[in-house]
């Protein structure tokens, strides 16, 4: 007999922002309405990201549900959702948590209203806890590499053979290669047939190599940029900065080859550094939230108008990554599964705020 249609309540347990740095557990938060393009997901696990603490501290939205990364089971589908999805599918993705325009949507809740064309079906071999680590890092890396750096999106090419005289397009630098976004970027680049090189601390060299880095450099080394230039034979034309620090901007600019290229980071960059190579390096910074194709109602330079092109790109990226997941080609960033349920999630946001997490992602079964 077919399974019964899940009963969806009108209220749920969720973690809601109350003010700057303040979250509380509500047991009467509204379950988001089912929109035509939405997959409503019963949450099984959530992951903590640095942005969870950052946005809460600097751009809180009182009354809004927080959280970005989730995994769970589809319990309802809107009228305009991809035909390959069905109720009962195990999926993962990310949402714009603590969104002033959609305050009922956030990952830290029993039910998540996710953009259906941006969710990934999990293979049977991947747990919810592992799947919860995919979303934000994956889409941030993809947006940076294939939209901002303008590397062609093709995750089905065979890796290029080692060449004694690499072409301009061979090498891509990932600064912060051991971060969740960095490991995603390294893996996507390797699958795209490119030659990723990375910077991170020596303690995480093996992690970066595991995800595809051809060479890894210690970003603490004062000669790091020169070493990268030497390794890439002064041809490096692409740099993705996952740390978004003044020092890493300087490092990336120093590592790019003589002809210059493109630099993209995850935060506003230092104009003084960018001015050092104004005619040869094109800098930009990305906000992963544009991938939903909706207006991003944040203050100052973080606010963005709706960008339908990023939404279309996100759907294409999802489709290609889904194929890789189905083939077992996607490895997951190391996760540390924590206990405590929703209370544990509150504590996890504070752990990330205090920068005590390195080389793995905190994940909570809920």
Curated annotation (Swiss-Prot):
InterPro entries: ADH-like_C (IPR013149), ADH-like_N (IPR013154), GroES-like_sf (IPR011032), NAD(P)-bd_dom_sf (IPR036291), PKS_ER (IPR020843), Trans-enoyl_RdTase-like (IPR047122). Residues 19-363 form the Enoyl reductase (ER) domain. GO terms for molecular function: enoyl-[acyl-carrier-protein] reductase (NADPH) activity; nucleotide binding; oxidoreductase activity, acting on NAD(P)H. This is Trans-enoyl reductase caaB. Induction: Expression is positively regulated by the cluster-specific transcription factor caaR. NADP(+) binds at residue 219. Keywords: NADP, Nucleotide-binding, Oxidoreductase. Monomer. CDD domains: enoyl_reductase_like. Belongs to the zinc-containing alcohol dehydrogenase family. Pfam families: ADH_N, ADH_zinc_N. The gene is caaB. Pathway: Secondary metabolite biosynthesis. Its EC number is 1.-.-.-. Trans-enoyl reductase; part of the gene cluster that produces the acyltetronic acid derivatives carlosic acid, agglomerin F and carlosic acid methyl ether. The PKS domains of caaA condenses two malonyl-CoAs into an acetyl starter unit, and form 1,3-diketohexanyl-ACP with the help of the trans-enoyl reductase caaB. Next, the C domain of caaA forms the ester bond between the acyl chain and L-malic acid (derived from the TCA cycle) and accepted by the A domain instead of an amino acid. Gene3D superfamilies: Medium-chain alcohol dehydrogenases, catalytic domain, NAD(P)-binding Rossmann-like Domain.
């Amino acid at each position: 007999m077919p399974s019964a249609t899940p009963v969806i309540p009108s209220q749920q347990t969720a973690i809601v922002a109350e003010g700057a740095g303040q979250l509380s557990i509500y047991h009467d938060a509204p379950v988001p309405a089912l929109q035509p393009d939405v997959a409503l997901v019963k949450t099984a696990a959530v992951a903590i990201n640095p942005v969870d603490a950052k946005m809460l501290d600097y751009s809180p939205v009182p009354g809004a549900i927080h959280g970005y990364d989730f995994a769970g089971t589809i319990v309802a589908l809107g009228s305009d959702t991809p035909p390959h999805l069905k109720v009962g599918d195990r999926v993962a993705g990310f949402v714009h948590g603590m969104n002033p325009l959609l305050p009922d949507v956030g990952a830290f809740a029993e039910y998540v209203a996710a953009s259906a064309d941006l969710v990934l079906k999990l293979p049977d071999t991947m747990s919810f806890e592992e799947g919860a680590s995919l979303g934000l890092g994956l889409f941030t890396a993809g947006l940076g590499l294939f939209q901002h750096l303008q590397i062609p999106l093709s995750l089905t090419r065979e890796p290029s053979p080692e060449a004694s005289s690499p072409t301009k397009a061979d090498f891509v630098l990932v600064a912060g290669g051991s971060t969740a976004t960095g490991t995603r970027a390294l893996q996507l680049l390797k699958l795209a047939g490119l030659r990723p090189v990375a910077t991170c601390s020596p303690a995480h060299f093996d992690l970066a190599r595991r995800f595809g880095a051809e060479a890894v450099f210690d970003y603490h080394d004062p000669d790091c940029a020169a070493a990268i230039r030497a390794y890439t034979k002064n041809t490096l034309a692409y740099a993705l900065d996952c740390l978004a620090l003044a020092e890493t901007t300087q490092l990336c600019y120093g590592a790019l080859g003589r002809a210059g290229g493109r630099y993209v980071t995850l935060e506003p960059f230092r104009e003084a550094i960018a001015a050092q190579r104004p005619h040869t390096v094109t800098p930009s910074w990305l906000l992963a939230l544009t991938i939903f194709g909706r207006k991003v109602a944040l203050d100052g330079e973080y606010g963005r108008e709706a960008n339908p092109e990023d939404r279309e790109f996100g759907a294409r990226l999802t489709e290609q990554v889904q194929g890789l997941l189905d083939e077992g080609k996607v490895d997951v960033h190391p996760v540390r599964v924590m206990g405590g349920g929703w209370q544990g999630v509150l504590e996890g946001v504070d752990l990330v705020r205090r920068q005590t997490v390195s080389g793995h992602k905190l994940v909570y079964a809920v």
